[in-house]
Amino acid sequence: MDGVLLLNKPKGMTSHDCVAKVRRLLGIKKVGHTGTLDPNVSGVLPICLGKATRIAEFLTGATKTYEGEVTLGAATSTEDADGDIIAVQTVDRTIARAEIEAVFRSLTGDIEQTPPMYSAVKVNGKKLYEYARAGIEVERPTRRVTIYELELLDEREQFVGETVSFRFRVMCSKGTYVRTLAVTIGERLGYPAHMSDLIRTASGPFQLADCVTLEEVERRAADGTVDALLIPIEQALFHLPKYEISDKVAEKVKNGALLRLPAFLQELDGPVLLVTPEREAMALYVKHPARPGVMKPLKVFR
């Protein structure tokens, strides 16, 4: 059983929990996900099965899209709704839609983020959340991320109340902390804030509408039709150049043979996916670093 399963991760489960559940339901060992979602976040979680576990690293860097909610007036220890409230300030003025949209424009493009203390980023070999649970604050390295699009989904022209919540959609690069983005939005509007809801609606080309629930996976496992849910490796790596090889060459590829680099790939910068005439993915190859005109295996899907 090889391919990518598009799971609609439910709230309340870790990404690891989902992998373990799929492993049990399908009775296979090689299962892995392509990018962690926090327990309180639902949505698109691509899960790689069998040979597809070897391509996980080529899917994790995909652009992500989320729909979420910012709540102004309260900050939390985790920057989301699960944490302890650490700051409160009544929203004592009317906030205009134009003001929020101006903040969104200011946060579009390349920005610097400091990972939250409750995150899996490692500092000195230890995950930040481990320091946080021990009550230890450590210096965290900033990271540059890209916000491609940031859109206000709420249709109101004015926002009034002791606390104010509004929904947004963001398309961003790998490694973006959307809860930290929510806090920054609040800061620029002059109030403590946290992310009160979040759902991942897309990961690269994979859309929420194409995802299945764990309950659906369980039903399909019971009637033996899980394979129909899987995206083949060749399709999952749609963004990579393809090179069709004969069945004879495919046998050599299985053994990790070096191959002549075809003319149309001379400018290749990164991996190319080798496929059979039947579109079966055989391997990922890259230019040989020391032998011009030759390519060597990076990953072979034996």
Curated annotation (Swiss-Prot):
The keyword Protein biosynthesis does not apply. It is an enzyme of class 5 (isomerase). Pfam families: TruB_C_2, TruB_N. It catalyses: uridine(55) in tRNA = pseudouridine(55) in tRNA. Keywords: Isomerase, tRNA processing. The keyword tRNA processing applies. Signal peptide: none annotated. One of its GO terms (molecular function) is RNA binding. Its EC number is 5.4.99.25. It comes from the Bacteria. The active site is at D38. Belongs to the pseudouridine synthase TruB family. Type 1 subfamily. Responsible for synthesis of pseudouridine from uracil-55 in the psi GC loop of transfer RNAs. HAMAP family: TruB_bact. This is tRNA pseudouridine synthase B. The gene is truB.
